[in-house]
């Protein structure tokens, strides 16, 4: 990297002239800052600031945690129609169908990262809702949407901070994309300025936080009562008997009033339920927080991987009790049948997008332990 305020390196200028996105990287040695403390200083309350953390097995910190902010593009989809904002908060409808629009944005955002950077150092970050499946499968009319949220939102951050718990360093990556219309000098200077601003924010003292208090949990409510849920079960069994379906998830939303700080909610969640996939996503007018033990899918170097989890027991209070619960879980016919069904569904899903004869089960019916539960995984 050239000194701040200097011209861009030759590789940056050459790649930019060829129309390829570029990154500017800065490494900070830091073994005191945590991803949570950093987010409180650089992302708290910022629209489209994201935090992704990992606690492997519910006990050991994963190697990487990520903060993203300052997207130059935000893509969203609702009811099959896509819109794009170029960082100014104003969304314009895309001329093509949603999948064509998304493919175009992905192609414009693809870049070659320098050696030594993890793959999540730049690109698109966001969420897909379940209703995005309607772009691929004919499912009939959509259900009512009481939350009135987009079906998907993807952001293209120009600043990504990667916390490496092995090297005890923070890697700052500022991405620049030629579709923004800047020349190489201006794009490089803007990337340097973003790194400077982030580093300044990071070096500030932590903001004062409200004193922690013990508060009663809010009451959760569901739009479905017990009788209504029983009716749903009966209808599902009828569909199965008729051959229309062979598995259904009877999900329904539990809601509670929350007037506190959304990030405080996330901090409580990560303490109570540490997991390999923790996230806090601030979209401005709504936030998402979650803690999950499993990936939905991963695509890396042309290989698709899924890891279905199904079958659960609570953790035992002693090692002996824990092993007994594991044996009980693996011997339970219902749990094994459910897991086998998910395994078959997973093979089918992967097979739809893979070369014939290349799908294989690498490992099956292994028990993974987390802070409060254990799961069967394949």
Tell where the protein language model's regions lie, with residue ranges:
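Extended alpha-helical targeting/anchoring segments
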Residues: 1-378
């Amino acid at each position: 990297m050239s000194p701040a305020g200097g011209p861009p390196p030759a590789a940056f200028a050459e790649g930019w002239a060829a129309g390829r996105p570029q990154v500017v990287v800065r490494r900070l040695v830091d073994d005191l800052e945590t991803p949570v403390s950093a987010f409180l200083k650089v992302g708290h309350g910022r629209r489209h600031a994201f935090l992704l953390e990992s606690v492997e097995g519910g006990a050991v910190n994963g190697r990487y945690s990520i903060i993203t902010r300052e997207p130059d593009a935000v893509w969203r989809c609702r009811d099959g129609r896509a819109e794009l904002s170029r960082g100014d908060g104003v969304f314009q409808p895309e001329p093509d169908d949603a999948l064509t629009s998304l493919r175009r944005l992905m192609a414009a955002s693809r870049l070659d990262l320098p050696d030594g950077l993890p793959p999540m150092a730049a690109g698109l970050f966001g969420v897909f809702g379940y209703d995005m499946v309607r772009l691929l499968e004919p499912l009939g009319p959509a259900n009512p949407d009481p939350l009135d949220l987009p079906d998907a939102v993807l952001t293209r951050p120009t600043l990504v901070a990667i916390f490496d718990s092995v090297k005890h360093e923070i890697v700052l990556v500022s991405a620049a994309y030629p579709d923004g219309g800047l020349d190489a000098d201006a794009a490089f200077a803007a990337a340097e300025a973003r790194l400077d601003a982030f580093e300044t924010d990071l070096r500030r003292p932590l903001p004062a936080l409200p004193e922690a208090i013990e508060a009663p949990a809010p009451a959760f409510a569901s739009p479905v009562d017990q009788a209504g849920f029983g009716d749903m079960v009966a209808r599902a069994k009828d569909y199965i008997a008729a051959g229309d379906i062979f598995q259904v998830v009877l999900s329904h939303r539990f809601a509670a009033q929350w007037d506190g700080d959304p990030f405080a909610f996330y901090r409580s969640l990560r303490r109570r339920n540490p997991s390999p996939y923790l996230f806090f996503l601030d979209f401005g007018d709504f936030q998402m927080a979650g803690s999950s033990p499993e990936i939905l899918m991963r695509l890396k170097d042309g290989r698709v991987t899924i890891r279905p989890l199904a079958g659960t027991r609570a953790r035992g209070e002693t090692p002996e009790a824990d092993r007994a619960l594991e044996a009980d879980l693996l011997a339970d016919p219902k749990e094994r049948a459910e897991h086998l069904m998910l395994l078959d569904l997973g093979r089918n899903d992967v097979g739809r997008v893979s070369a014939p004869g290349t799908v294989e089960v690498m490992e099956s019916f292994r028990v993974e332990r987390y802070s409060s539960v254990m799961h069967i995984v394949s």
